[in-house]
Structure formats: C-alpha cells, structure tokens
Amino acid sequence: HVDSSAASDVYKRQVMSCSRVGMEEIGRGIDTELDETRDPEGRVLHTKHNGMHCVNIYLPNGSSRDQRQAYKDQWIEDLMEWAEMFVGSEEPAILCGDLNIAHTEDDIWDPKGNKRSSGFLEHEREWFTRLLDRGWHDLLRIHIGPQKGPYTWWSNFRRARERDRGWRIDYVLANDVARSMMKSAEVMREGGMVVSDHAPVIVDFDI
C-alpha cells in the first residue's frame, strides 16, 4: 500500500496488477521518436503473465483545457506507433484500461449532445478506428455484438449511474493470438460502485 499523500506531486492514485500464474514486469511508459519524454505521467505498465503481454493504459483526458487535449492527441498517436510491436506478435498481447474515448455512438448514452466533448470528438473516434484497422480487436464488442452499451463510466452528477447515462471508455483490445484465446467478456456494472465511477471489464482467456 502506498500513501496517496506521498505522491501528491504526481497523482493521488495507485495502480495494481495481480496474477495467479506469475508476473514479469517488462517496462513502464512508452518510448517512441514522437514521445521523447517517455510517458512522464506514468500511464503505461507492461507486464507478462504466463506468456501473455498485458499493457495497462490510462489514456489522458483532454476535457480540462486545450493544452491537455493537444497532449492527448499527441499521446494517442505515440501509443499507436509504440503498440505496433505487439499487434503482429506470435505471442498473445492485450491493451487494456481506461482509454478515455467512446468509439461509436453505441458506446455513449447521448452521442448528439457530446459531439464536442473530449472523449467523443470525431478525430478521437477516427483514431480508434485506425487502431482497430491495424489489427487490434475490441473483445467486449466482439463477444456481445452490436448494441447500445454496456457502459463502463458514469458521471457522479445527476444520478447518471442509476439512470445508466454512461460512456464505454474502458476496453480490452487483443491481437489475433489473444483474440483466439478469449472465452467470454462482460462488464460488471455494479462492480466498484463504492470506490469508483468506473465498472470493471472482465475478459476470460484460455491460457
């Protein structure tokens, strides 16, 4: 356990990665020609579990000001370039976490009202489509098929969670090898309700 006050100059948050089959930490952050700062905010953790690469991501939120949106826009391009090493790998690999983008109109309760909102901007959604076109698979959407939702994040205001007015911004994306190992995928809507405004995405793999 880390006291959040000790990290007040960075983030008052902690991240945990657990495994029943053993775990090897490969690296933290991304390193590309575009991002010489190597992810100074510590938004990526790359671990390996019984042969499967697991890249945990907390993608920047651009809603606070234009400068942060510009940082987010650069960051997602860096991420796409960096993740190329995994997408064609013969080893299973997943990108997972809070990507802060609702990809399609099915992934947000009010698409018309949020067209100018960070996380649902046209260029962000186009980036997500390009990411999938490179060979990544959205496992939850593949498993449940086309439908409205399910959502993984709700605002703390206006009883959004109770009324299910949410966004799907948390994902598990897989390369071809990892996709072939998927058994099931779901959102635990009530999961984490006490401690978070997000719900966990659970994917079961046969590894």
Predicted regions: what they are:
Residues H1-A7, Y11:
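Single conserved hydrophobic/aromatic residue that forms the stacking wall/gate
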Residues K12-I26, A160-M181:
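Conserved beta strand-loop-helix elements of the APE1-like EEP
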Residues R13-V15, E41-H46, R168-D170, D197-I202:
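Short hydrophobic/aromatic beta-strand or adjacent loop that forms the aromatic wall/cage
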Residues G22-H46:
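A well-ordered secondary-structure block
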Residues D31-D35, L59-I76, K112-R116:
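Surface-exposed cleft-lining segments at the edges of enzyme active sites
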Residues E41-Y58:
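Beta-strand-turn-beta hairpins that frame and shape the catalytic cleft
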Residues W75-I169:
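Metal-dependent phosphoesterases centered on the DNase I-like endonuclease/exonuclease/phosphatase
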Residues A185-I207:
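Surface polyanion/phosphate-binding segment centered on an Asp-His-Pro turn
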